Amino acid sequence: AQKFDGIIIEPTKSANFNPNINYYLNIESLGIPYIMINAYYEELGPTSVLLDDEKGGFLQTEHLIKLGHRNILGFFKTDDMQGTKRLKGYLKAHRFYGVPINQNNIITYSTEEKLTKPAEILENILDQSVDSLTAIVCYNDELAMSLIDVLRNKNIAIPDDISIVGFDDSFLAEISEVKLTTIKHPKIKLGEKAAEKIIDL
């Protein structure tokens, strides 16, 4: 069997207990170093390279608050550590600026629900009260693009009627007809840092 010198892993569902923990314990018993990037499984306590997702969620929300928004819907994928931390940043920004938090404005979803639940919830909210909602914080750009489609189908102008902020600064933000405000994700820098760290292990 081929022996690896090291493995860089991006965990999925990192906010949940990992049922495949034995795979990682086997890697450890073989003496193969590994690093987790973007998130980590807490029970393993591995070496990891992370983005400050809490600060990212704070910056997304702060941007909208500074533009005068007070009724900000937040969509967070909470089976990933990144989502729980971005939600924490969203809450922190509201507290910091003294903006009341409406519990109904916090929408959480799982990886399996990402293609359906957020869009359906936004449609329902818009059908009930289009006037009060003025801004949306999105877990990532992929979600932002999906929600932009919902808004356009309802003839809601962005950012005139509703402002929307993404996360990742992905190619989706670049190709979108709507100029999407998004938090930059230093993907290359993160990868370089992980490579440097694994060489040192």
Each predicted region: which residue ranges?
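Bacterial carbohydrate/catabolite-sensing allosteric modules
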Residues: A1-I8, K13-L201
